Amino acid sequence: MAAPDYALTDLIESDPRFESLKTRLAGYTKGSDEYIEELYSQLPLTSYPRYKTFLKKQAVAISNPDNEAGFSSIYRSSLSSENLVSCVDKNLRTAYDHFMFSARRWPQRDCLGSRPIDKATGTWEETFRFESYSTVSKRCHNIGSGILSLVNTKRKRPLEANDFVVAILSHNNPEWILTDLACQAYSLTNTALYETLGPNTSEYILNLTEAPILIFAKSNMYHVLKMVPDMKFVNTLVCMDELTHDELRMLNESLLPVKCNSLNEKITFFSLEQVEQVGCFNKIPAIPPTPDSLYTISFTSGTTGLPKGVEMSHRNIASGIAFAFSTFRIPPDKRNQQLYDMCFLPLAHIFERMVIAYDLAIGFGIGFLHKPDPTVLVEDLKILKPYAVALVPRILTRFEAGIKNALDKSTVQRNVANTILDSKSARFTARGGPDKSIMNFLVYHRVLIDKIRDSLGLSNNSFIITGSAPISKDTLLFLRSALDIGIRQGYGLTETFAGVCLSEPFEKDVGSCGAIGISAECRLKSVPEMGYHADKDLKGELQIRGPQVFERYFKNPNETSKAVDQDGWFSTGDVAFIDGKGRISVIDRVKNFFKLAHGEYIAPEKIENIYLSSCPYITQIFVFGDPLKTFLVGIVGVDVDAAQPILAAKHPEVKTWTKEVLVENLNRNKKLRKEFLNKINKCTDGLQGFEKLHNIKVGLEPLTLEDDVVTPTFKIKRAKASKFFKDTLDQLYAEGSLVKTEKL
């Protein structure tokens, strides 16, 4: 493995492929702010020496020094096959280093913003109001000083003592990021709580981490008050939102269920404004983190048992930032402009934390939804007009359905749109890059594409990142043409600080997660009991190692030893395939398989992934097989906007049905359900007949966190789902196969 401090700038200085980039940087002192800013303007690395060269071989196999049977070769990015990169530069080895760089270089740029509410009318203003990087830097240091002062006074410790964990419980908002930056400035570790992680889980995390402080949104007040008696170590409760003097007095004197914690420390409510004021009048010098400082403990629920706390260091996040810089491109005409991103996905999950880390490193303005409701996303996108946004497949499929429904309102409009989209799709397939044709800019954009982009608030958008779940290739191809935007699908886990690979935006053959990035290496391990042989067909369990990968679970050596071997390889539990270009595709999940009555092996996650990635008519799926039966049944979430038109082709009355009526009729009308089932089965050419569903129960969102059948990242808790849906599954088997006579 590479030395932990190998920098992106070291790679550029030493690799002859980047000679032209090295020449451009020669006029600056290496590592200076001016050098780094010029470097940012010349990236990504994939442009050197030629982008087309990179596309042909994105990752390369290096020798397997251990020569172990049952493993593939080790794969590294073709950009950095000799060493793994752990930072952009040796002056930028932590997330705090990156933020402070941006605050120095672009102090007046917009940093954190939200839509203000007009208190007189109670309506939200049609604009975002931002605080600058300079202001955010000042505020986060004041908040950090205030946290240390208040907590340590209660603990009777020196004010600069930073040996504790800060817990955060809130929806996305600027105060979330301010708190995170305050922790970075004083080398404080934080952890995020979220109510959907499971009953009593927040209390479990607070007590496991021994966090003395909880910073929360006012909307979580009831939950916090309910938890107080079970919080053993919390002495400071901080509400992010404004609290009046009377509200604070009532909380501390009347509503607080207990007055002291288990250490006999008094528990007190504060507002974040008070904490900031304390820090302003009692400034404590910053305590910058080192690469080995523990940045965050990110709890991942998994599909069984208590959540595991993934320890992520500043080296992990700095490595992830370096990977992002190596692959993202900002065009020359945008480099000196104020650009924006929308913080939409939950900050309690590592995916959005990684996105925001990059945003803060490059000087983006970060906007937040005006209320924690995903249905207002498009409304706020239209106002912010972001340059980039990270979205999950469920949102993209809704975009697809909405666009198609809008285009279907007239025959002429539909025919014009189909002509344009077919032409663009052909150009993408032929070129393998963005459509730079005159026809695209003078005709296609004016007639169709600009209108679609404006309707979704994506008029300034350059790329969309997606991950966390499979996405249909048809959805990717359609949106790429309809929006003329590169969509990049990534792969990563909490343990790898989100994405370690990312597909290229305009590749001819979509569907992979791209090649391993510059901050990690990977290999495949054979899973013979599932028929995967890594050393023969490059299919097996994906293992990852490198500076972007975690080292341990918090206070959990047993789970750590199961996940990470003595050589540092983290076993992901995902079965992957590596193609001839070095790109990774996830195809299955280790250990989740069973037999049907005739002896066929069934891998339900593989089947679910194929349905979700191939069929635009569904949003969720749980595949179930009774070992005493000969066929599969399932619980399916239906995308009504996408499904309604295909069913209405034979049944015009379907167009008049509400979403609820459509779902009700699908479940009640066996003939209609059979037609829908045949439609979704025809999408899944990659499945054998015995792997396809024979009967289904549909719903709008049948797999919910509230029913405890999925994790917060929507992985199925298979045992709990089987129990929860037992009666329904039994009914489906009693009804029998709907497709026995069909050719599957």
Curated annotation (Swiss-Prot):
Its main location: cytoplasm. It catalyses: a long-chain fatty acid + ATP + CoA = a long-chain fatty acyl-CoA + AMP + diphosphate; (9Z)-octadecenoate + ATP + CoA = (9Z)-octadecenoyl-CoA + AMP + diphosphate; hexadecanoate + ATP + CoA = hexadecanoyl-CoA + AMP + diphosphate; (9Z)-hexadecenoate + ATP + CoA = (9Z)-hexadecenoyl-CoA + AMP + diphosphate. CDD domains: LC-FACS_euk (cd05927). It is an enzyme of class 6 (ligase). Induction: By oleate. Optimum temperature is 25 degrees Celsius. Gene3D superfamilies: N-terminal domain of ligase-like. Its cofactor is Mg(2+). Optimum pH is 7.1. ATP binds at F299, T300, S301, G302, T303, T304, G305, L306, P307, K308, G309, V310. One of its GO terms (cellular component) is endoplasmic reticulum. It comes from the Eukaryota. One of its GO terms (molecular function) is decanoate-CoA ligase activity. A motif (FACS) lies at residues 567-617. InterPro entries: AMP-binding_CS, AMP-dep_synth/lig_dom, ANL_N_sf, LC-FACS_euk. Keywords: ATP-binding, Cytoplasm, Fatty acid metabolism, Ligase, Lipid metabolism, Magnesium, Membrane, Nucleotide-binding, Peroxisome. The FACS motif is required for catalytic activity and substrate specificity. Belongs to the ATP-dependent AMP-binding enzyme family. Present with 358 molecules/cell in log phase SD medium. Activates endogenous medium-chain (MCFA) and long-chain fatty acids (LCFA) by esterification of the fatty acids into metabolically active CoA-thioesters for subsequent degradation or incorporation into phospholipids. Preferentially acts on C9:0-C13:0 fatty acids although C7:0-C17:0 fatty acids are tolerated. Is the main if not exclusive MCFA (octanoate, decanoate and laureate) acyl-CoA ligase. Required for efficient MCFA beta-oxidation inside peroxisomes. Facilitates the transport of MCFAs into peroxisomes by passive diffusion, by decreasing the intraorganellar MCFA concentration. This is Long-chain-fatty-acid--CoA ligase 2. It comes from Saccharomyces cerevisiae (strain ATCC 204508 / S288c) (Baker's yeast). The gene is FAA2.
